[in-house]
């Protein structure tokens, strides 16, 4: 099955041990556009673990990127549905025209 892809590009971390915060700034690509998304992990400084903080911050950035991608796809879907309605309406109209012409021709 084919699908639209959200491609991970890069991730940088800002580590603030003194306040127990890790911020991941990740870049993703979708539809040729680069998205820069941040994710944050926090805990009390006494429980700070840099590796766990990085994993959580990156996972939150990825989750936010998926949400953003879903929003973009929903917008595209609405546009496509509007266009599909025009196509379906046109097909119905042309079918009616063909039926009308068939009826007209059969009168002779």
Predicted segments with their positions:
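Catalytic phosphate/metal-binding cores of nucleic-acid and nucleotide-processing enzymes, i.e., regions
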Residues: 1-108
């Amino acid at each position: 099955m084919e699908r639209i892809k959200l491609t991970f590009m890069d991730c940088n971390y800002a580590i603030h041990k003194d306040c127990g915060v890790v911020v991941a700034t990740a870049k993703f690509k979708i539809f040729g556009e680069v998205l820069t998304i941040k994710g944050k992990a926090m805990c009390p400084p006494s429980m700070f673990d840099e590796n766990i903080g990085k994993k959580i911050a990156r996972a939150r950035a990825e989750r936010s990127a998926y949400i953003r991608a879903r929003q973009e796809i929903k917008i595209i879907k609405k546009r496509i549905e509007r266009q599909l309605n025009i196509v379906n309406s046109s097909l119905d109209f042309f079918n009616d025209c063909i039926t009308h012409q068939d009826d007209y021709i059969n009168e002779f």
